[in-house]
Amino acid sequence: MKNKTEYYDQFISKIPNFPKKGVLFYDITSVLLKPEVYSSLINEVYSFYNFKKIDCIAVVESRGYLIGAPLSLKMQLPLVLIRKEGKLPREVFSEEYELEYGFGRIEVHKDDVRMYSNILLIDDILATGGTLKSSAILLERAGGKVKDIFCFIELCAINGRQSLESYEVNSLVRYN
């Protein structure tokens, strides 16, 4: 996927010391304030994945939803939600993950993933790779196969891609 850092960088807010001291937070919600930029992002992801064999899109709470939901509509594919612990009402698979700034647990409904389905996994940012790695494990435990992973932003210096080396990983914006 072509690197679009220069273009999208002007629309991404950077907030120092959030959510804790020493962390630089990349806020993609500012992209939503520019419909033409948001539309461009969705169209670029669509043009890259439209011809790949994908059966469903799985999204990581919550900013992954901002990319995955409009993309699933455009591609006419089911949308599988990966949520934080305790947010899903039916029986779930659960997995612990490590963040850039702590630990957490994510879940997916056991019956939302079809056996052997090819899944495009989406999140807004790739930092340590902990959330995405746990999400991929979760989806595979549910019977799916993670075919591709897409992140709008990749923090290359943290090297999260290394923890995802068994997956195809793509990003539009890369910060060093």
From Swiss-Prot:
SUPFAM superfamilies: PRTase-like (SSF53271). GO terms for molecular function: adenine binding; adenine phosphoribosyltransferase activity; AMP binding. Keywords: Cytoplasm, Glycosyltransferase, Purine salvage, Transferase. It is found in: Cytoplasm. Pathway: Purine metabolism; AMP biosynthesis via salvage pathway; AMP from adenine: step 1/1. It comes from the Bacteria. Pfam families: Pribosyltran. It catalyses: AMP + diphosphate = 5-phospho-alpha-D-ribose 1-diphosphate + adenine. Its EC number is 2.4.2.7. GO terms for biological process: adenine salvage; AMP salvage; purine ribonucleoside salvage. InterPro entries: Ade_phspho_trans, PRibTrfase_dom, PRTase-like, UPRTase/APRTase. GO terms for cellular component: cytoplasm. Catalyzes a salvage reaction resulting in the formation of AMP, that is energically less costly than de novo synthesis. Homodimer. Belongs to the purine/pyrimidine phosphoribosyltransferase family. This is Adenine phosphoribosyltransferase. It comes from Borreliella burgdorferi (strain ZS7) (Borrelia burgdorferi).
